[in-house]
């Protein structure tokens, strides 16, 4: 007779996987202030690999993740093996970020981890928007390990994957656990925007969604963050 699979074993497995995910490198930051579940953070410059994909939030996340994972797992040309470069594997980092973009948008926004940031229009001086719902075009980012520079990173073989250095910025961050549906992400975004308005803190960019865990992580162990760039206090 088979012994039943105890729920505590399942929970322990989820904890183990969650801890393993958190062992990956993350961008360093300084916490400037903290109130409840909201932090104001200062991030130094770092490099991202990013791609633009179409679809709803879930479909775009999967497409973008696969494209950039393909790059870091070896679909590239090493910068260190000239004149006949081979491929090079790059360590996975966290978070992965996503941002929604307008159909003709060319502007690139920061990620901190997978994150989401909506752009109001293609114009570079367009106002920021707090809406993450109903977007059909997204930019997905992976943060590159800190050991690399733009010159030393392998060159993507896929022209849809681009490398970019993100300048130092200050962010308001709201963390939470669980699944990320579009309505839930919008709820958290609205909560963070309301807090910024109450504190009279100027937002400078569009909200982004940062996700730190692999998809098999149990919901209660998932680490998610909504991030909005702000004027440094």
Residue spans for each PLM region:
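A solvent-exposed interaction/effector surface
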Residues: 2-233
């Amino acid at each position: 007779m088979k012994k039943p699979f105890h729920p505590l074993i399942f929970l322990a497995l989820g904890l183990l996987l969650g801890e393993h995910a958190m062992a990956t490198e993350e961008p360093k930051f300084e916490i400037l202030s903290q109130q409840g579940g909201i932090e104001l953070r200062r991030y130094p410059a770092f490099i991202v690999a990013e791609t633009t994909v179409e679809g709803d939030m879930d479909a775009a996340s999967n497409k973008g993740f696969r494209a950039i994972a393909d790059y870091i797992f070896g679909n590239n040309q090493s910068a260190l093996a000239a004149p006949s470069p081979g491929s090079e594997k790059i360590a996975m980092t966290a978070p992965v970020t996503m941002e929604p973009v307008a159909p003709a948008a060319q502007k690139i926004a920061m990620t901190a981890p997978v994150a989401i940031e909506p752009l109001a229009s293609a114009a570079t001086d367009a106002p920021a928007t707090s809406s993450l719902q109903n977007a059909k075009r997204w930019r997905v980012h992976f943060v590159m390990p800190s050991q690399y520079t733009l010159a030393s990173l392998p060159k993507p073989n896929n022209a849809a994957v681009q490398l970019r250095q993100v300048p130092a910025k200050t962010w308001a961050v709201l963390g939470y656990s669980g699944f990320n549906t579009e309505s839930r992400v919008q709820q958290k975004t609205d909560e963070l925007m309301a807090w910024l308005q109450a504190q009279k803190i100027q937002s400078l960019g569009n909200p982004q969604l940062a996700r730190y865990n692999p998809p098999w992580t149990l919901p209660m162990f998932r680490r998610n963050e909504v991030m909005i760039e702000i004027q440094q206090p």
